[in-house]
Amino acid sequence: MLVPKRVKHRREFRGKMRGEAKGGKEVAFGEYGLQATTSHWITNRQIEAARIAMTRYMKRGGKVWIKIFPHKSYTAKAIGVRMGSGKGAPEGWVAPVKRGKVMFEVAGVSEEIAREALRLASHKLPVKCKFVKREAE
């Protein structure tokens, strides 16, 4: 699973996800991509589940690029603990994804296979997604 090797601060602020993604809105490496149409946090487990769903459908053919990385930690207090007495312990890692960001890219397979593989991956994610193609240069 994807986790940072080391971080400066273990506990981060939640932050706000306003507007669209600044970069990474076009398909850069592959031929086809999966673009987010809503903003959300995506956990490292969701990214891994989407990757497995894609590679299983493509039967190890083609190449997959994961263009998001879970660099932000999120915390949670234990169940049954009252409010107060500090921030909770780090629970996991998330990648904040804004709308318009291309999260996954695929190359080396036909469009039908890529479309279905990315559709299966989108079912594992908490964001609404759309299939995008690389623009002709």
From Swiss-Prot:
Output the GO biological process annotations, alphabetical, semicolon-separated.
translation
GO molecular function: any one? Answer: tRNA binding
What PROSITE patterns does the record point to?
RIBOSOMAL_L16_1 (PS00586), RIBOSOMAL_L16_2 (PS00701)
In terms of Gene3D superfamilies, this protein maps to:
Ribosomal protein L10e/L16 (3.90.1170.10)
One cellular component term (GO) for this entry is:
cytosolic large ribosomal subunit
- Keyword RNA-binding in annotation: yes
Kindly state which keywords UniProt assigns to this record, in alphabetical order: Ribonucleoprotein, Ribosomal protein, RNA-binding, rRNA-binding, tRNA-binding
User: One Pfam family this chain carries?
Assistant: Ribosomal_L16
| SUBUNIT field | Part of the 50S ribosomal subunit.
Query: What NCBIfam families does the record point to?
Result: rplP_bact
Entry function = Binds 23S rRNA and is also seen to make contacts with the A and possibly P site tRNAs.
Q: What is this protein called?
A: Large ribosomal subunit protein uL16
Per the UniProt record, the lineage of the source organism begins with: Bacteria, Bacillati, Bacillota, Bacilli, Lactobacillales
